[in-house]
Amino acid sequence: MTRHFLLAAALLCSACLPAFAHEAGIHAEPSDAVPAAMDIIETSVGIAGDMAVFSTRVRGSAGAETPAATGNFAGAGVYAYVWPTGLNSSDVGFEADQGIVALAVTFHPDFDDAANGGANRDVWHPHWVVLAEDAACNGGLKVVDIAEGTAPKVPATWPKVPLLIDSPDYATDLSGDTVKVTLPIALVGGLVNAAYDGVTAGLRINADLHAPLLCVDDVFKIASGDHSLPGKVSTAQ
């Protein structure tokens, strides 16, 4: 798997500060240049029993920063806490080798993208996304588009949008300074010993509503500071 996501993100990152990583997580120095709610100071992915826990701790209150509502889908903003991983897209229900697999906790007040037509625009919620390079995006990356007339393999909770995105109903909690997602490890192949990093980012729907439909627009912070997915999923002893 390439490191294109983190390499491109680094070009926009306002605070790629030194960090250190081990099996307990990736730790980063705080930065006043980053909004406190997006200023990652620690991120981790661990396994306890039959559950996996993705966690990010920030300098401020998790979830306190959200994009302004515009009332329109075109050009709508998305804020996200993201864990880019070394997983293959086939590990989360898509065709193999489609791009960079990331778990993201997102907020977007102008549209819903829950599974089965559900509403989620007013809450932070999780997605699996597959990312790829695209020079048309300000951040150099997009959520992979599904071309018209094609029918690739998608997970059962795909929200029926033309993107490689999944909307699983994982337990998601934003409390104090921490964002946490808990999911059954049986649902994700290859997670044990997988590499990961932590990123906070803004994305945006294309104002023209054509591909690339959803672009990485801005990056607030990369936990590792060196764009190398240095984290390794830990297992409780």
Task: Describe each model-derived feature in a short phrase.
Residues 22, 41, 65-74, 191-201:
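Extracellular/secreted glycoprotein ectodomains characterized by long, lumenal stretches
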Residues 22-39:
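Short N-terminal segments immediately surrounding and downstream of signal-peptide cleavage
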Residues 34-132:
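Surface-exposed, glycine/proline- and aromatic-rich loop segments on solvent-exposed faces
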